[in-house]
């Protein structure tokens, strides 16, 4: 493998939502600021039927996993979703989901759900009151035992959670179930973290450690299975498919992906699952099913490890007189083809038509690490501009953190933007995707031209998709255009998404695999002796390196960092796993050993995997955990 070179970075100041010069801007933001941004998002930016509280709660939980401060998450979470003891926000989530799915609870079921919400709020309120009394004996009477209160609350959660899983309404109630599960798992985590202060016995502590693992498993599997059952029934255009996925990820899987990390503390989760957004224009009318999703997903993800610079392509604008003697004219705009560009001179395959005559280029203007794209306009339609002038428009426009806009056409219509997310990739589809492409997902970093079948009427067309991700701790661009990951300056741990590799050998047998119960997607190795290299900018701290892997069959993992080799042999998670069936993967977190991230230098981290015949292997997460904080289970 090539040696790693640091291209360096110049820091400048800008201000727009997320400060691009601060690679840890999310961690530095107050929760009040996060809440205001999601409220503004709902008010001004998006038509998606989504209550802003769902984004706020996800940010809150990520902040808590990344912190040692605040061991009573349940109390703070209660104040977020039951402000002033009200269940209105939870009811808002239900109403928004009813609108999105075009389904409603019947009168009796709605009454039951509302009663359960009221009861859940009251139970959480009472438990927190009892803990307050226990911790402040001079103020109120002390309960006989906090353990009794803990066990009672545990049973109340077990009684109430099934009420959000009612037959016939599982998908509709899934966002409420996820919030109730947030409360339950936060409660269990609180019990473990406060065991000494609350006088919890060693036996009870062991029980609750098991609870955290087991209910994380049960709730994750329920959410994954419910979503996948619904997704398999889709037969719709791309815009609707992506909107359904985005809705469920924001409402449900933002939480599911955090639950399996509840066992860690002071761990900065620096990446996550992607959100995909497209335009709602009428031209791209091909219907897709879940069988087509592996290809579409691979197309949108294939170059996620590179630093996005923009896209170029061919556009066409025609103006002609209106027919039948009508005054004025009609102007049509069309994006014929596009190619996505990355730092380091890397480009994707052609989308829409190949070859094509390029006549425009859309870039971030300034270095992409300093001013990444945060908002996209990918809509299209027709309207009347001036007297008797009709314009059929298409947008394909992007905005950076500086508020600068650029693109193939003018920004108009609905925009795609999510607080604390950056557009880390751009992709797209032609007018019609060929069957031979739909049946053959792209391998890692594959460059493939994607065009409509020959002879398709109007087939030279491209429709963009923006790929949004929380990833921000990027120190610099590697010489090959990929990311160099930045470790925090303090002793906070951090994660690296496996799909954000510097380079991978055996690329034709390496694929990105979608995951739900994990912070982001996995890298699936299908060939023996595959090595993925990651590059991180160190801080001099030592960490315990954990690799989250799924190895259905035996494998050997060799990690090389700072010239030292760490080996884990006979890795097999077929039965020895955390219990979550994550899109075919069954993962376990393997403690590789203590590693040092050398200070002020770019550190290569090589992960080599040898596989026994028939082994299915997914590298799902790379976690560098502070050495003085052990996982809760």
Curated annotation (Swiss-Prot):
Keyword field contains Cell cycle: no
One GO process term, biological-process aspect: sporulation resulting in formation of a cellular spore
GO molecular function annotation: signaling receptor binding; toxin activity
Additional note from the record: Toxic segment of the protein is located in the N-terminus.
Family: Belongs to the delta endotoxin family.
The protein's role, per its UniProt record: Promotes colloidosmotic lysis by binding to the midgut epithelial cells of lepidopteran (Manduca sexta) larvae.
Protein name: Pesticidal crystal protein Cry2Ab
Organism: Bacillus thuringiensis subsp. kurstaki
Upper taxonomic lineage: Bacteria, Bacillati, Bacillota, Bacilli, Bacillales
């Amino acid at each position: 493998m090539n040696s790693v070179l640091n291209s360096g970075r110049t820091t400048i100041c800008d201000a727009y939502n997320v400060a691009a010069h601060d690679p840890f801007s999310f961690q530095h933001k107050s929760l009040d600021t996060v809440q205001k941004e999601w409220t503004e998002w709902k008010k001004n930016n998006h038509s998606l039927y989504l209550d802003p509280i769902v984004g706020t709660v996800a940010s809150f939980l990520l902040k808590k996993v990344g912190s040692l401060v605040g061991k009573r998450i349940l109390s703070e979470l209660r104040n977020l979703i039951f402000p002033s003891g009200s269940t209105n926000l939870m009811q808002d989530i239900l109403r928004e989901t009813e609108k999105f799915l075009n389904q409603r609870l019947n009168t009796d079921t709605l009454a039951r759900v509302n009663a359960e919400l009221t009861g859940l709020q009251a139970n959480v309120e009472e438990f927190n009151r009892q803990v307050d009394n226990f911790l402040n004996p001079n103020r109120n009477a002390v309960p006989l035992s906090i353990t009794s209160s803990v066990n009672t609350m545990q049973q109340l959660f077990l009684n109430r959670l099934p009420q959000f899983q009612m037959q016939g309404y599982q998908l509709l109630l899934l966002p409420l179930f996820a919030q109730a599960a947030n409360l339950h798992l936060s409660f269990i985590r609180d019990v473990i973290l406060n065991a000494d202060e609350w006088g919890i016995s060693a036996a009870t502590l062991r029980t609750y450690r098991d609870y955290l693992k087991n209910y994380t498993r049960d709730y994750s599997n329920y959410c994954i299975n419910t979503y996948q059952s619904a997704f398999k029934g889709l037969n719709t255009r791309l815009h609707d498919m992506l909107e359904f996925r985005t809705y469920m990820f924001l409402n449900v899987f933002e939480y599911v992906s955090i639950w399996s990390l509840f066992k860690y503390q002071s761990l900065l989760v620096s990446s996550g699952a992607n959100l995909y957004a497209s335009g709602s224009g009428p031209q791209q009318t091909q219907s897709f099913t879940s069988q087509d999703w592996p290809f579409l997903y691979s197309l949108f993800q294939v170059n996620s490890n590179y630093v996005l610079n923009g896209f170029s392509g061919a556009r066409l604008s025609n103006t002609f007189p209106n027919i039948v003697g009508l005054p004025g004219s009609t102007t049509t705009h069309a994006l014929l083809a596009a190619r996505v560009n990355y730092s380091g001179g890397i480009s994707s395959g052609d989308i829409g038509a190949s070859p094509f005559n390029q006549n425009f280029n859309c870039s971030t203007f300034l270095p992409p690490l300093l001013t990444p794209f945060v908002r996209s306009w990918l809509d299209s339609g027709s309207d009347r501009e001036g007297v008797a002038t009709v314009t059929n428009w298409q947008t394909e426009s992007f905005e950076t953190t500086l508020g600068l806009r650029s693109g193939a056409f003018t920004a108009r219509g609905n925009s795609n933007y999510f607080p604390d997310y950056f557009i880390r990739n751009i992709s797209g589809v032609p007018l019609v995707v060929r069957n031979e492409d739909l049946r053959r997902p792209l391998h890692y970093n594959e460059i493939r031209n994607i065009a409509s079948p020959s002879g398709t009427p109007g087939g030279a067309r491209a429709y963009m998709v923006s790929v949004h991700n929380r990833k921000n701790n990027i120190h610099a661009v590697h010489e090959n255009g990929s990311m160099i990951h930045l470790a925090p300056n303090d002793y906070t741990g951090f994660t690296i998404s496996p799909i954000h590799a510097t380079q991978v050998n055996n690329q034709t047998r390496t694929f990105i695999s979608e995951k739900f119960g994990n912070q982001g997607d996995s890298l699936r190795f299908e060939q023996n002796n595959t090595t993925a290299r990651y590059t991180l900018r160190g801080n001099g701290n030592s960490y315990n390196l954990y690799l989250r892997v799924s190895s259905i069959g035996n494998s050997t993992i060799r990690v090389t960092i700072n010239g030292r080799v760490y080996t884990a042999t006979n890795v097999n998670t077929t039965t020895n796993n955390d219990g979550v069936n994550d899109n075919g993967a069954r993962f376990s977190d393997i403690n590789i050993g203590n590693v040092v991230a050398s200070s002020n230098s770019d550190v290569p981290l090589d992960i080599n995997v040898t596989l026994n015949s028939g082994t299915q292997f997914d590298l799902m997460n790379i976690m560098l955990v502070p050495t003085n904080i052990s996982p809760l289970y």
